[in-house]
């Protein structure tokens, strides 16, 4: 054990990027920050925390709730408040998802609200360097999704953002200002999503066939992989060019060209299956032990 720390949370949420980790209690007013040396700070937000996002550069963004207003605050890992964005819920909607860039200078947020009795959803980009200083509320781009609810946004890498809607996924490129790369529109409701630095994965259930259909796209929005499975996989991951799927006992690993690299049934069950940096090394965890395995 390199270090350990204790803290009190009721409903746990966390965000990790590089060597930085942030942990918060949803509805509480504390954010705990960590790096590889241990706990850095217990940040008192004064308002209830709804979401957090941490960057490799050492910044934490948090959505805070205050009656009819919500705030998106940025803190250093030591707890200094760097900026505040104030959003009126009845005008802007609720910030349902946020993600901060690796350098901490850009933030994307998905908002959902009601306007004239109809659902409205949007994705907004903020810039906190010199470019953003010249823009109103530091907004450098916004995209309207109408009644399509965007439930999650994330930075895949330093310059690529993905926004996941119910039946549409958008890829954006951002240096200082965002540009739409491609809208991926599908004729089904997306059940699960997963991602890596260079790929995104979509899963939906074919109820007629009682099978899951898994599709993987690159950051240009081109489909590069598709599989149908009746294994009822519960977990999906992408690491480099490896696509990992597993359930309580069964695990399969594909390469992005569709070839099976590994397929096995673990009789002791699977709690987690974690890819390591080396292409053929993994951490296998079950309820009784943890084991590092190397594929031939």
Regions found by a protein language model. Name each.
Residues 92-209, 213-214:
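Acidic, serine/threonine- and glycine-rich low-complexity intrinsically disordered segments
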Residues 23, 62-63, 108-110, 163, ...:
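Residue position within the beta-strands of beta-propeller blades
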Residues 1-6, 37-44, 81-88, 134-144, ...:
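A short beta-strand motif characteristic of beta-propeller blades
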Residues 29-32, 68-74, 115-127, 166-173, ...:
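Structural motif
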Residues 170-266:
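Intrinsically disordered, low-complexity segments enriched in Gly and acidic/Ser/Thr residues
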Residues 35-38, 75-80, 128-131, 174-177, ...:
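Short loop/turn segments that connect beta-strands within beta-propeller blades
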Residues 7-19, 47-58, 90-100, 140-156, ...:
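Repeated scaffold domains used in trafficking and secretory/extracellular systems
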Residues 3-110:
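Non-cytosolic head/periplasmic domains of membrane-anchored proteins
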């Amino acid at each position: 054990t390199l270090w350990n720390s204790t803290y009190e949370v009721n409903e746990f949420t966390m965000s990790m990027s590089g060597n930085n980790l942030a942990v918060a209690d949803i509805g509480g007013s504390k954010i705990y920050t960590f790096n590889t040396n241990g706990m850095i700070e217990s940040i008192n937000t004064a308002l209830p925390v709804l979401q957090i996002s941490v960057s490799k550069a050492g910044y934490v963004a948090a959505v805070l709730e205050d009656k009819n207003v919500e705030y998106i605050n940025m803190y250093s890992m030591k707890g200094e408040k760097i900026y505040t964005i104030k959003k009126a819920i009845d005008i802007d909607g609720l910030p349902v998802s946020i993600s901060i860039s690796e350098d901490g200078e850009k933030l994307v947020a998905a908002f959902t609200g009601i306007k004239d009795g109809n659902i409205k959803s949007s994705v907004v980009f903020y810039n906190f360097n010199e470019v953003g200083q010249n823009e109103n509320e530091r907004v450098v781009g916004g995209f309207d999704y109408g009644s399509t609810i965007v439930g999650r946004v994330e930075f895949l890498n330093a310059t690529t953002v993905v926004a996941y809607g119910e039946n549409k996924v958008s890829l954006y490129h951002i240096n200082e200002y965002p540009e739409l790369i491609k809208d991926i529109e599908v004729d089904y409701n997306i059940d699960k999503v997963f991602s890596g630095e260079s790929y995104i994965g979509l899963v939906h259930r074919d109820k007629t066939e009682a099978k899951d259909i898994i599709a993987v796209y690159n950051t240009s929005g081109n489909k590069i992989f598709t599989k149908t499975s009746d294994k009822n996989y519960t977990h999906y991951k992408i690491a480099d060019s490896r696509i990992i799927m597993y359930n309580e006992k069964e695990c399969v690993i594909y390469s992005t060209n569709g070839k099976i690299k590994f397929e096995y049934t673990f009789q002791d069950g699977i709690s987690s299956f974690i890819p390591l940096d080396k292409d053929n090394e993994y951490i296998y965890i079950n309820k009784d032990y943890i084991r590092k395995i190397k594929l031939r």
